[in-house]
């Protein structure tokens, strides 16, 4: 049993909600003793099944507290036999207490003293003003952009914030790396939940808020705001499954869709038309829709534009705006450094999304192009996200990739920079709270795409998994694929694995690392060894390696 007070819009309701999660058969009856006890305490006769009885008890307890009974609902979660009862709330203490007493009622443990205390709990809530901690529309004075998806959220958030700031506006954003006001870090850590959004929206300097939003915050606390003006949904892939009752990618998409569901009717939702799961969320949206695609001939794009909508698409190496019969060139990918002239397709996806969001904010085409052109893939603008260095004739690609699709993109991009006949060494691993299937998938991708695989262990991110277990799963997959001879013999941390790969490499080789833990130490080592950002050093060599 779990009771959770969700302070903002969530997967159950687009308002603050209490979630009461139970392990329960849908037709499980109310025990006879509980029915008799409830009749004595509340003077009511319960329906026969728990699933029918609990909403009635919640309603009666609200009345006894002096509150209007809310409309309660049930939802089956992905975890077998897990059901969630949910209802809206306004006062925290009494709302949670009602959930606790509802469970006690079904268990036959409800007593009159507990029920009689509810008005006092409500009065205390009101004295303390213990209400949902989210930013209501009447308290929000600036435009807000919500950014969600599985991969690319932080990069898209950073890029859009840079575009806004480059045109002269004060911008605040929150992301996995912290809360920033005009580029200055004011809170360090992962702030993709409601606390980060509240901090940005409360800052008196900020004129535009860009709010990266991860599924964890939505599931555990709800959104940190009532609505946004523009939202972006990038993609959905299998990540963080089997957590908090979410076991399928379809339900994961629904959780992330909360960000686009709360976009104001007069606002704009930006959806990636290349991802069928993202495109399917159109039915949940109340705002206008803008689509993006890396295929100008995508049927969804053509139908959307023909129906009066607009889209930002990749057409060869141009990024263009399609609206009605017009085709407007926004910029060429050679002028978008973060895409490495279009080689990094997953970064192109982020550029398209940020561009559509910028246009939705009223940013001019010229300001958009200027912002994209000055956002470089380095530690100044996008630390840890596809940062490429040339070092002694080798390429080192450092990226935050942490799942199967991220690793696949990392390998494909790294290969695109290499000349034939050279080797790609890949450092692979992820956080321990991922499903076993994620480690299996990483093993398959590494076995298929790398010439040499270094399995990494990150103790800081074991998150309950025994040390060595994730590495063992990946090792078994790679060996079963006949690629055991391409495995480095021991698992190392990120920094030591990179040193080992560098020592074994030759000029012309590339080393790609899934780096989530030791970024700063790695960047320091590369700097001390004289490595240069590849976009700067590429001019000295057509192959992209230092001369």
Model regions: which residues?
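P-loop NTPase switch/communication element
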Residues: 177-192, 196-198
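Extreme N-terminal, non-catalytic leader segments
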Residues: 88-142
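ATP-dependent carboxylate-amine ligase
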Residues: 1-92, 116, 245, 359-364, ...
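A short helix->loop->beta-strand "cap" motif at the edges of active sites that frequently abuts
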Residues: 142, 263-268, 285-288, 422, ...
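Residue-level signal for inorganic ion chemistry
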Residues: 174, 212, 234, 270, ...
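Adenine nucleotide phosphate-binding catalytic loops in nucleotide-utilizing enzymes
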Residues: 246-253, 267, 287-408
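Walker A (P-loop) phosphate-binding motif
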Residues: 133-178, 185
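Flexible active-site lid/hinge loop adjacent to a nucleotide/diphosphate
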Residues: 191-284, 290-291, 296-303, 335, ...
């Amino acid at each position: 049993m779990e009771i959770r007070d969700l302070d903002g819009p969530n997967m159950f309701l687009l308002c603050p909600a209490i979630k009461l999660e139970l392990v329960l058969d849908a037709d499980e009856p109310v025990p006879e003793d509980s029915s008799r006890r409830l009749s004595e305490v509340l003077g009511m006769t319960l329906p026969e099944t728990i699933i029918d009885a609990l909403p009635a008890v919640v309603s009666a307890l609200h009345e006894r507290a002096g509150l209007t009974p809310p409309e309660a609902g049930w939802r089956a979660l992905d975890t077998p036999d897990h059901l969630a009862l949910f209802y809206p709330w306004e006062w925290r203490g009494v709302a949670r207490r009602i959930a606790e007493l509802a469970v006690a009622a079904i268990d036959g443990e409800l007593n009159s003293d507990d029920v009689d205390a509810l008005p006092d709990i409500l009065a205390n809530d009101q004295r303390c003003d213990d209400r949902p901690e989210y930013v209501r529309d009447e308290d929000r004075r600036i435009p807000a952009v919500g950014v969600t998806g599985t991969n690319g959220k932080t990069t898209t958030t950073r890029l859009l914030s840079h575009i806004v700031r480059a045109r002269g506006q004060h911008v605040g954003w929150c992301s996995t790396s912290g809360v920033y006001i005009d580029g200055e870090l004011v809170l360090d850590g992962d702030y993709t939940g409601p606390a980060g959004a509240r901090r940005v929206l409360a800052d008196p300097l900020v004129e535009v808020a860009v709010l990266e939003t991860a599924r964890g915050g939505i599931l555990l606390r709800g959104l940190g705001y009532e609505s946004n003006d523009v939202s972006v949904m990038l993609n959905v892939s299998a990540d963080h499954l089997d957590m908090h009752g979410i076991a399928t990618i379809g339900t994961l998409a629904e959780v992330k869709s909360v960000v686009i569901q709360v976009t104001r009717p007069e606002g704009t939702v930006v959806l990636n038309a290349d991802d069928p799961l993202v495109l399917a969320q159109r039915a949940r949206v109340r705002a206008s829709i803008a689509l993006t695609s890396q295929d100008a001939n995508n049927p969804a794009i053509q139908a959307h534009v023909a129906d009066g909508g607009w889209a930002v698409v990749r057409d060869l190496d141009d990024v263009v705006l399609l609206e009605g019969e017009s085709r407007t060139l926004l910029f060429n990918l050679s002028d978008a450094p973060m895409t490495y002239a279009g080689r990094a397709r997953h970064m192109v996806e982020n550029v398209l999304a940020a561009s559509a969001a910028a246009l939705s904010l009223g940013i001019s085409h010229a300001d958009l192009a200027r912002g994209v052109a000055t956002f470089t893939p380095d530690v100044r603008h996008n630390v840890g996200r596809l940062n490429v260095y040339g070092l002694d004739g080798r390429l080192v690609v450092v990226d935050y990739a942490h799942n199967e699709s991220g690793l696949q993109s990392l390998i494909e991009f790294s290969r695109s920079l290499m000349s034939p006949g050279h080797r790609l060494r890949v450092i692979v691993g992820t956080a321990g709270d991922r499903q076993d299937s994620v480690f299996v998938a990483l093993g398959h991708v590494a076995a298929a795409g790398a010439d040499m695989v270094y399995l990494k262990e990150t103790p800081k991110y074991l998150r309950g998994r025994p040390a060595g277990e994730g590495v063992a799963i990946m090792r078994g997959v790679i060996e079963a694929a006949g690629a055991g001879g391409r495995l480095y013999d021991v698992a190392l941390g990120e920094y030591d694995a990179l040193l080992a790969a560098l020592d074994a490499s030759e000029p012309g080789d590339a080393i790609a690392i899934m780096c989530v833990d030791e970024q700063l130490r790695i960047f320091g080592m590369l700097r001390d060894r004289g490595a240069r950002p590849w976009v700067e050093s590429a001019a000295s060599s057509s192959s992209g390696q230092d001369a």
